[in-house]
Amino acid sequence: MSKIVKVIGREIIDSRGNPTVEAEVHLEGGFVGLAAAPSGASTGSREALELRDGDKSRFLGKGVLKAVAAVNGPIAQAVIGKDAKDQANIDKIMIDLDGTENKSQFGANAILAVSLAAAKAAAASKGMPLYEHIAELNGTPGKFSMPLPMMNIINGGEHADNNVDIQEFMIQPVGAKTLKEAVRIGSEVFHHLAKVLKAKGLNTAVGDEGGYAPNLGSNAEALAVIAEAVKAAGYELGKDITLAMDCAASEFYKDGKYVLAGEGNKAFTSEEFTHFLEDLTKQYPIVSIEDGLDESDWAGFKYQTEVLGDKIQLVGDDLFVTNTKILKEGIEKGVANSILIKFNQIGSLTETLAAIKMAKDAGYTAVISHRSGETEDATIADLAVGTAAGQIKTGSMSRSDRVAKYNQLIRIEEALGDRAPFNGLKEVKGQ
């Protein structure tokens, strides 16, 4: 038995300089797992609760000492002596002990950190890499693939201090034959984009996820400068590289309308905004749009799915918040055709795996994702490979908190070789 003998929680700092929870899980035999919870900026209202202290005298109220105390106290007491290899049981113990619908007693940040640390410790005790252990937990032992990255090279919305409404403009290096080649192509386009922006006298400072955050004349201009950079890098848009966007539309949804500051404060209805996006897909090879409407606008999402769902991937992030109850409703109503997977929206590895399985069983794709507040923890790389999810969103080609995930994927690809195919555009719904 891989018995848990010690659990340690601590407050560490994330990529935005805010505190987050790190957990260590120690097993018999000296095996240790270490994991940290990420944190979002544009968050869905139905996400599991991230517990913050609210004490304005520390970290402007963002301390996580209460969550850390939960790890070191009741959570540790409950899981010590239990088998770390039984992930479902470890997670159930913590969820039941918390006793709330949204993990607000201990905080999803506390429960998730322990959940992931336990998985890492269990993998170590089995003498296998984390991705291999995750594949076993997923009921798909030995089944791996390398994910197609969505690289967020222009940041707007809540991730940047600029006038661009749409939160993420991403490139997907679909012409690559391997993950490593995809990273190289992404890096080359990223550097050419800096040159394009500089030549236009635009800012090349980066946002939370490592993409550039220039002030632009419109949202379409972001796509235009990316197209220029792709060409300058020697690649063909639509063949070597496709585009993806995260609208994070809840952030500019006001009084039932979608108000775009970057389009001269123009207000759109749900239908009008869907057609605004449809027009962009006709001008550029956009194959994936995330949160194209507000999380509460289910009628609008149904319409958007009818208009665009057979042509492109429509990803629900704030819409589904990695929650199987909400995803089930979406599947039944024919809303979206893909789910974004974020550990900390739901708060445990077991529930995350359940959401991925439900999506795949329904013919939806699952896109594994970072948060805008990250750490050096690269667990999502192992999750993407170990569930053969097929797609990953982990930022741009700068900032160590983003690059850590790409580097881990490069290592995993090297270790697995032909056992983990890179399927490129075939992974994207509708392509």
UniProtKB/Swiss-Prot annotation:
Q: Which organism is it from?
A: Yersinia pestis
Cofactors (names) = Mg(2+)
Please list the residues that bind Mg(2+): D246, E290, D317
Query: Which protein family is it in?
Result: Belongs to the enolase family.
Indicate yes or no for the key word Cytoplasm: yes
**Protein name listed in UniProt:** Enolase
The cofactor note from the UniProt entry for this protein is: Binds a second Mg(2+) ion via substrate during catalysis.
User: What positions does UniProt annotate as the active site of this protein?
Assistant: E209, K342
- Extract one GO molecular function annotation from the record: magnesium ion binding
| Superkingdom classification of source | Bacteria
Going by the UniProt record, its keywords in alphabetical order are: Cytoplasm, Glycolysis, Lyase, Magnesium, Metal-binding, Secreted
Q: Name one GO cellular component term.
A: phosphopyruvate hydratase complex
